[in-house]
């Protein structure tokens, strides 16, 4: 049984599916890394690696996986609803509505919009958004944020919202400003 099979079993088991998983492997190809991460691994470390790097990555994965103490379901759902103007975001069900109409968002689009709305008025650079939404180990282009913002604006506009509720702050980044 290889690491991918172990990972699959961990993710399928309801008792273990939320455990953080780091794959330590001899496979170092880009496709192997992408496959491992997309299959549910929280991190992927090809051999050889340093002990200090391993320790730092374990600490980072544990930090990200910490969950607040369980609350009753009603309290969770109340805190999960975020309402700004016409926009309602439910963090628990991962649903976004504009005046009662559901909008379908990709996972990162949802997380990006949620982060901006939750922190309304605060300007975030592309790098900060990559760190907050994609995680510390994102190695892609910072322009990824621009593409996602463009997609979010388009979807908001299609449902009658002003796409410029996500403001571009030239030379800095983006912020959310609710419609009046």
Residue ranges: model-predicted function:
Residues 8-13, 18, 22-83:
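Basic, amphipathic DNA-recognition helix from helix-turn-helix-like DNA-binding domains
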Residues 12, 118-121, 136:
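Short helix-capping/hinge SLiMs at alpha-helix to coil transitions
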Residues 48, 55, 106, 139, ...:
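Conserved catalytic core of two-component sensor histidine kinases
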Residues 52, 122-133:
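Short coil-to-helix segment of the ABC ATPase nucleotide-binding domain corresponding to the Q-loop/switch region
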Residues 60-123, 127:
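Short, Lys/Arg-enriched segments at the junction into DNA-binding effector domains
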Residues 149, 153-180:
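DNA-binding patch around the recognition helix
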């Amino acid at each position: 049984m290889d690491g991918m099979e172990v990972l699959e079993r961990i993710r399928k088991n309801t008792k273990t599916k939320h455990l953080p998983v780091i794959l330590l492997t001899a496979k170092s190809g880009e496709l192997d890394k992408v496959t491992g991460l997309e299959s549910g691994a929280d991190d992927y470390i090809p051999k050889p690696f340093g002990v200090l790097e391993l320790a730092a990555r374990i600490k980072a994965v544990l930090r990200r996986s910490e969950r607040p103490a369980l609350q009753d379901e009603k309290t969770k759902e109340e805190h999960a609803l975020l309402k700004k103007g016409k926009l309602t975001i439910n963090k628990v069900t991962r649903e976004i509505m504009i005046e009662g109409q559901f909008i379908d968002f990709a996972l990162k689009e949802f997380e990006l919009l949620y982060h901006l709305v939750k922190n309304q008025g605060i300007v975030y650079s592309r790098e900060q958004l990559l760190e907050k939404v994609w995680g510390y180990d994102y190695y892609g282009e910072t322009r990824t944020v621009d593409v996602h913002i463009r997609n979010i604006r388009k979807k908001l506009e299609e449902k009658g919202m002003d796409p410029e509720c996500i403001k571009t702050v030239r030379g800095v980044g983006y912020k959310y400003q609710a419609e009046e």
